[in-house]
Amino acid sequence: MGQGASKIFGKLFSKKEVRILMVGLDAAGKTTILYKLMLGEVVTTVPTIGFNVETVEYKNINFTVWDVGGQDSIRPLWRHYYQNTDALIYVIDSADLEPKRIEDAKNELHTLLGEDELRDAALLVFANKQDLPKAMSTTDLTERLGLQELKKRDWYIQPTCARSGDGLYQGLDWLSDYIFDKKNKKKGKKR
């Protein structure tokens, strides 16, 4: 009896483990976002050569976030981080209006979404640097990134400012809700 109650208690109150792959073009703000979520403050960053991995606890979920560098020469290495990814956070610099960069961001995103190992991963797009005067709106970015074309993938775009933290937790709220909904749907299918 005691052992059964302890198992139920453990399942109710244990933290869910979720593996997140956070990618995007260089200088989009990925590392700033990671450490703002983890430490609650802005840290001085340098371009990520390789990856940073940290655990962010939020809403009884341990998000293990793999922040992988976005330089052109590093992007082919992203595929080494796909395995067991539950969700993808794609960070875009909303104020980078250079057409080639926007096209590169779209192409890289759609390449990721075409990968078999990421077929079940939810997509959260952080439209970062919304505090800058010429930042594109989420509506504009949705169109430019071709998000409306994603019919078989759960996705959400959240305006953010990594430095102030604006929008970051709203994005994690969507991700948390998605994960719990997905978990409950799986339970329902087993019956």
Swiss-Prot record:
Gene Ontology CC annotation, any one: Golgi apparatus
SUPFAM superfamilies per the UniProt record, alphabetical: P-loop containing nucleoside triphosphate hydrolases
A biological process term (GO) from this entry: vesicle-mediated transport
Organism domain of life: Eukaryota
Sites of N-myristoyl glycine lipidation: G2
Coiled-coil regions listed in the entry: none
A molecular function GO annotation: GTPase activity
Keyword field: ER-Golgi transport, Golgi apparatus, GTP-binding, Lipoprotein, Myristate, Nucleotide-binding, Protein transport, Transport
Record's function text: GTP-binding protein involved in protein trafficking; may modulate vesicle budding and uncoating within the Golgi apparatus.
NCBIfam families in the cross-refs: small_GTP
Protein name: ADP-ribosylation factor
Species in which this protein is naturally found: Giardia intestinalis (Giardia lamblia)
